[in-house]
Amino acid sequence: DRCLSRGLGDVYKRQFNEVCKKGPVADEPVMGMMVRLVDAKLHEDAIHRGPAQTIPAVRNGIKGAMMRAKTVLLEPMQKAFVSVPNDWLGQVTREVTNRRGIIEDMPSEGDVTTVVGVLPIAETFGFSNDIRAASQGRAVWNTENLGFEMLPPQLFDKVVGEIRTRKGLKPEPNPESYYAC
């Protein structure tokens, strides 16, 4: 309360919002996070508790806490509907499952089956050409966005490294200790 009553509450809120725009893991927006300020020591002399001192301390404290927490990445997902003659059903289901897809349903009408699967959007690049090749051009497909799901933990380090490299950052994020004051 003492920190907030000295006008620093706005500094904390602003830094929280800034960190949430570009998190320390992948330099991507952060959501679903709460920070609770438990304690803060301020220098007695007002000249030593200005923005130049408090902003980096608050920002680094939030980033350090994030690195200590069990951070997850969310990836966009989509549902694919692929209608294909039964002769090419195996090839189409293989294309879906090879892209971390999960087949939810396969209703049939005559000699055409519709494969209904959920796939990460990141795995769908080239999907159109591969489905066309797998079905000799006989498949018809479309997709709908499903929102976001948690990236499987075993892919976390690989995907974070790819994102960071694409952004010109070193592949591994700074550890919690980097942000210690």
Located regions from the model:
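Flexible, glycine/charged-enriched surface loops at secondary-structure junctions
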Residues: 22-32, 68-78, 106, 141-142
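Glycine- and Gly-Pro-enriched alpha-helical subdomains that act as flexible
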Residues: 39-77, 81, 86, 90
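Single conserved hydrophobic/aromatic residue that forms the stacking wall/gate
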Residues: 1-12
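Charged, surface-exposed alpha-helical interface/stalk elements
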Residues: 75-181
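Short, contiguous acidic/charged loop-to-helix segments that flank catalytic cores in large enzymes
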Residues: 6, 45-49, 116-118
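Beta-strand-rich non-transmembrane domains
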Residues: 30, 34-41
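A broad, structural surface signal
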Residues: 10-17, 59-63, 90, 94, ...
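Conserved helix-loop functional segments at active or binding sites
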Residues: 14-25, 39, 60-72, 98, ...
